[in-house]
């Protein structure tokens, strides 16, 4: 994350009201938390920088940080799930957000945390603690406002 100017001092501090129930157990979650086998312990600005890296096809300034091949593969449907690439959700199939381009892709984290890449409009949208049934509506509103 140093190469994209992300902060190096951010720490996890759970919010007072960030408790979730998982399998009957109360678990504290934080936006971008990594309790569940993956995740990023970063703030919203750093999430946006991460998204910008992928919006720019793996380039940061004049330096390639992620290969073209990786970007291509991560945004192609996987064999087992047309709505999933390499660790990114795709706007296809059963996860399609109606009225939005199929080339949109996004990272989705526990607790309603999203980093959405909208290539056609050169947008990165970071959403925190949003109901997963509402994220498509939010993206549509942002895209429509950007037109």
Residues of each region from the PLM?
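Active-site Gly/Thr loop motif
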Residues: 8, 13-34, 38, 42, ...
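Active-site-adjacent helix/loop patches that line small-molecule binding or acyl-intermediate pockets
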Residues: 1-17, 45-48, 53
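Beta-strand segments within the central parallel beta-sheet cores of soluble alpha/beta enzyme folds
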Residues: 12, 64-69
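Structural helix-adjacent loops and short alpha-helical linkers that scaffold large soluble proteins
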Residues: 58-66, 133
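Non-transmembrane alpha-helical segments in soluble domains
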Residues: 1, 48-55, 71-75, 89, ...
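A general structural signal marking secondary-structure boundaries and capping sites
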Residues: 57-58, 146
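Structured C-terminal helix/loop/strand segments within mature extracytoplasmic catalytic/sensor domains
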Residues: 107-147
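Soluble non-cytosolic domains of exported or imported proteins
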Residues: 41-45, 132-133
